[in-house]
């Protein structure tokens, strides 16, 4: 299959999930779109090197996480985060972002540290198996289970604080 058809298939199959994961990682819709686009460009350029040791979804998710991390590392991102907080306080921000920010669960996930947030996103939003998550984060399955359980407990604490209570 030619590279352009391959990338189109990847975008159709994983595009929405990758964009959602990048948004949850970056907390900014425009940056998430940039990260998702960069993910598919990198996937297209590296597809012939993909050795199929893991699933395609695991591979492209790893690329998306790395693209998101690269954006986070930039000084521009750090500066724009301060501006973003001010922007979110205004009445003219993106309605998609506003909807996601108002969602209590999404907001609670955003309050988790990066590692815990990554685990929750990969497990619940990307619907990856523990084995696939372990490959992505470079840990054993048992360690991944322990970390996921710890992230769940932290998320539960945050949700209880905002009024969800014991359920």
Go through each PLM region and give its residues.
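A short pre-motif secondary-structure segment
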Residues: 119-123
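DNA-recognition helix of helix-turn-helix
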Residues: 65, 137-161
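Σ70-family region 2.3-2.4 aromatic/basic alpha-helix that recognizes the −10 promoter
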Residues: 40-44, 54-77, 152
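C-terminal flanking helix
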Residues: 19, 40, 113, 117, ...
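Internal acidic/polar
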Residues: 70, 78-110, 129
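Short, small-hydrophobic-rich alpha-helical interface motif
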Residues: 18, 22, 32-43, 63, ...
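A short, charge-rich alpha-helical start-of-domain segment used by transcription regulators
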Residues: 1-20, 33
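Pre-recognition alpha-helix immediately N-terminal to the DNA-recognition helix
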Residues: 6, 17, 104-107, 117-118
């Amino acid at each position: 299959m030619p590279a352009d058809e391959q990338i189109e298939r990847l975008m159709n199959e994983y595009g929405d999930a990758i964009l959602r994961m990048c948004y949850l990682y970056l907390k900014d819709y425009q940056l998430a779109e940039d990260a998702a686009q960069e993910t598919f460009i990198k996937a297209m350029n590296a597809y012939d090197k993909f050795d199929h040791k893991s699933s395609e979804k695991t591979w492209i998710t790893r690329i998306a996480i790395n693209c998101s991390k690269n954006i986070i590392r930039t000084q521009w991102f750090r500066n724009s985060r301060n501006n973003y907080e001010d922007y979110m306080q205004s009445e003219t921000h993106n309605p998609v972002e506003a909807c996601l920010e108002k969602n209590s669960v999404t907001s609670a996930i955003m309050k988790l540290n990066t590692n815990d947030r990554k685990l929750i996103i990969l497990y619940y939003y990307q619907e990856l198996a523990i084995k696939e998550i372990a490959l992505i984060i470079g840990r054993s399955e048992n360690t991944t289970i322990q970390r996921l359980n710890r992230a769940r407990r932290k998320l539960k604490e945050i949700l209880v604080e905002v009024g969800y209570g014991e359920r």
